[in-house]
Amino acid sequence: MKTNNQLKNENAITLIALVITIVVLLILAGVTIASLTGNNGILTRASDAKIETAVGAVKEALKLEQGEKRIEGEQLTPETLLAEGKVQRTVQQEEDGNYYMYYALKNNAIEGMQGLGKGNIVELKDVFLIDDNLNVKYISNNGKEYGDTINNKILEDETKIRFASKAFSDYVSKISGVTEEEMKFKWMKNQTSLTITDSSVDSLQDLVFFPNLTSLQLGTNSSDAPQIISMDGVENCTKLENLKIYYGPDKDYSTVEKLDNLETFYRYAGTDYNNIIDGLKECKNLKSFSVISQNITDMSRIAELANLESLDLRLNQIEKIEGLENMTNLTDLKFDFNRIEKIENLESLLKLKAIYLTSNNISDITPLSANISLTTLDLRGNSQIDGERSNYTGQRLVALDKIERKYKKEFYNKF
């Protein structure tokens, strides 16, 4: 007996075959590819019709929900939809220098979206936007717009801001010295750095009102770390360059991949190393990566962060150096307090200037002779290293001499 998944797959294959057959028949009938796929082509018009139908269905669903709210003596607005978890916000600075706030429907939040609206709210692609009058506009991945003209909501310096999270609102009120009722966009707009040290904060959605942040820190110790399990909201901080996270629960970092300007990432404690790699592997400008005290045993996924210059994996359980063979931009490595027994897979790192290997299980340092740019080497706490020159012969002695000559002043090996 066939499973539902098998039937779905067969139906999908049948549909694809049908579409291909129709296209072939149309071509044989003299219909050109341009007339199929051009701006006014059959397929383009079919796609437009689907989108216009979806826009109409969403508008109708909102009207029905609005009617239900009125019966209950309430109103339906983007803010009430936000409170219900059906809408997300983004703040964009446009070419005129003004900041505009947009409300976008979340995926499948309203009946009739037909699989649309799964896109990037920060880039305003594949999104349904609504305004205070419940006008609906859909923006496709190619930037084409469908539906209503929506009223842009300008955020001026004196615009009062209402946060979605009460805990976040309380914290901002405390650090700004402004009551929640008097919070205005100007203060948030002017912040380039924000540190959140309140364990009651459990959401970053309100970072939408901090469009100019370049540095964000969550927590300083285990008692003040925000209880955030998802980094959703941080994608609105498109200028963010530095992100530091101390303690707190393991997190979903999927939205971090949208931070094109992120250069430095630091995480202390937790066990979310793989989640971090999943989220940061698309951050092509990431230069410095630190994940400390996470009991990491396998570091091979570091290879997915190809452009790193500095790597810090102190206080873990790493036994083997791996994944660095093609990371030729690395200049700084910190592996203190791990279980590394062998210096290996570093030969290609010709730009490497510093390596810290305090308190590991290393016995042979001669492989470091290949790293011609190395000027700083810390091997303290590796008691297995043989300090007797007479025990070195052949190529190992040549390598040792090379290291000693290079580090006449800088090299120290207190073991």
Which residue stretches match the model-derived regions?
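N-terminal leader/signal peptides at the extreme start of proteins
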Residues: 1-13
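Periplasmic/extracellular, small/polar-rich flexible segments of pilin-like filament-forming proteins
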Residues: 67-156
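Asparagine/serine/threonine-enriched low-complexity, disordered tracts
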Residues: 212, 239, 261, 285, ...
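N-terminal capping/linker segments that flank leucine-rich repeat
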Residues: 136, 141-224, 232-271, 276-290, ...
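Membrane-proximal N-terminal amphipathic helix
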Residues: 41-75
